[in-house]
Swiss-Prot record:
Role noted for this protein: Binds directly to 16S ribosomal RNA.
Sequence ranges of Basic residues compositional bias: 7-21
InterPro entries for the chain: Ribosomal_bS20, Ribosomal_bS20_sf
Protein name: Small ribosomal subunit protein bS20
UniProt keyword rRNA-binding present: yes
Gene3D superfamilies in UniProt: Ribosomal protein S20
Amino acid sequence: MANSAQAKKRARQNVKARKHNASLRSMVRTYIKRTLSAIAGGDYAVATEAYKKAVPVIDRMADKGIIHKNKAARHKSRLNAQVKALAN
């Protein structure tokens, strides 16, 4: 348990940061799910639009360290491959 005032403050800040980071991670997952559901719908235009909205969010969270940069790259690559497969 935190004893010093500094340690208590850091504990409070960590709780706040954890909640904020969880919210941001949830947002990334939501954008990915929206893109996947658009792909499942089979409409190339809708899937492309969803992908274009998801990519900047994924990149921003990777830059902030919310998700690892390799994980962001993996998601973008797989989503892009699925969207391109709809074009054929």
